[in-house]
Amino acid sequence: MGKNLGLVVSFYLCITFALGEYFSETRPITPKQLVVTNLHFFFHDTLTAPNPSAILIAKPTHTRGDNDSSPSPFGSLFALDDPLTVGPDPKSEKIGNARGMYVSSGKHVPTLTMYVDFGFTSGKFNGSSIAVFSRNTITEKEREVAVVGGRGRFRMARGVAQLNTYYVNLTNGDAIVEYNVTLYHY
């Protein structure tokens, strides 16, 4: 009985594979042209009251070799919703915001590892954003961070953002950073 059942199951499996059809519609595709876009804006990171745009959400209880008087000691985690503007003046035209997190990841050299979505809320890029996931050595006046993605007009973007510290208050951590971004996208 068991032998016959095995033969019947094998027979049905063979028929299923022989008669089963896989349907797929094949369409010719023409690759889209790669587009290069250059963006320029200012990022305002404010840690101080009365209206902070970045807040400390976790801080280590103790770290070795770290300066505890730093506004972002090693191991600190921050959430941010920072405004993006056309100019360095905080009152200049707002074009979007940067939302995400960064962690103080440099034990001896002040460094942030950031993952931030830069969303644009006005102009021709309204509703689009770029994603940055990179190391940011904040004591260097000029540095680069990697653009690893995007959405909207910047779908599948990749590129680099060159950062230039326009202003920084080393006591409280407030900063204004100029971004020059080169994007490659479709």
Swiss-Prot record:
Residues in a coiled coil are none
Glycosylated position list? 67, 126, 169, 180
The keyword Secreted is assigned to this record = yes
Q: Where in the cell is it found?
A: Secreted, Extracellular space, Apoplast
Q: Name one GO cellular component term.
A: apoplast
Q: What are the alphabetically sorted keywords of the record?
A: Apoplast, Glycoprotein, Secreted, Signal
State the Gene Ontology BP annotations: phenylpropanoid biosynthetic process
Could you tell me which Gene3D superfamilies the record lists for this protein? Allene oxide cyclase-like
InterPro entries named among the record's database cross-references: Allene_oxi_cyc_Dirigent (IPR044859), Dirigent (IPR004265)
| Secretion signal, residue range per the UniProt entry | 1-20
What is the purpose of this protein? Dirigent proteins impart stereoselectivity on the phenoxy radical-coupling reaction, yielding optically active lignans from two molecules of coniferyl alcohol in the biosynthesis of lignans, flavonolignans, and alkaloids and thus plays a central role in plant secondary metabolism.
Q: How does it assemble?
A: Homodimer.
Give the family, as the similarity comment puts it: Belongs to the plant dirigent protein family.
Q: What is this protein called?
A: Dirigent protein 4
Q: Which organism is it from?
A: Arabidopsis thaliana (Mouse-ear cress)
